[in-house]
Amino acid sequence: MGITSAMVKELRTKTGAGMMDCKEALTSSNGDFEKAIDYLRKKGMSAATKRSSKAAKEGTIASYIHMGGRIGVMVELNCETDFVAKTEDFKNTAKDIAMHVAASNPTYVNPDEIPEEALEREKEIYRSQALAEKKPEKIWDKIIEGKLNKYYEEVCLTKQKFIKNTDITIETLINNLIAKTGENVIIRRFARYQLGEELKK
């Protein structure tokens, strides 16, 4: 497919990579944005990749209270400098993420935090399902990969669709902020509380 300047601009906005790098990535991936982003990451061309080695020790802790005080969230969002931490873009992003956590109830920040035993348990379930559905064994790995990606979207904050703009994920939201600020930005941790959730009826 033809690669348009609008596509290149959109990829550049999402990743912070150079225009020529974005065009190369889109050409290589035949216009597939997710594959183009992966291409840039593998090449170390995205702003997120370049900034990831920088220490992010400044930042803010944002809070959000929802549903008449029945759900509360705190999110720690980190960056490299106090200057960026005080910007409205940074503070608003932290607040938006806290609001998202309240609504979407993720379990982990990203897939790296999922315990290995939990992943193996999920994979075993998917294998059993594939066997029960009499799927050819040669496509099991592909089926498991697809189901794992769906699982990540359910339990991992960074893989979820952003509630205020479902065209992007939380990961893309962070990458956009990295591109805009020129600093490494990471979601360090979050906590979500729901009134009475630990009480037995």
From Swiss-Prot:
Stretch list, region Involved in Mg(2+) ion dislocation from EF-Tu: 81-84
Q: Where are the transmembrane segments?
A: none
Domain of life (superkingdom): Bacteria
Flavoprotein as UniProt keyword: no
Q: What is its main location?
A: cytoplasm
Which Pfam families does the protein's record reference?
Answer: EF_TS
Where, subcellularly, is it found? Cytoplasm
GO cellular component terms, semicolon-separated: cytoplasm
Q: Which GO terms describe its molecular function?
A: translation elongation factor activity
The UniProt keywords, alphabetically, are: Cytoplasm, Elongation factor, Protein biosynthesis
Entry similarity comment: Belongs to the EF-Ts family.
Role description: Associates with the EF-Tu.GDP complex and induces the exchange of GDP to GTP. It remains bound to the aminoacyl-tRNA.EF-Tu.GTP complex up to the GTP hydrolysis stage on the ribosome.
Q: What is this protein called?
A: Elongation factor Ts
Give the organism the record lists: Syntrophus aciditrophicus (strain SB)
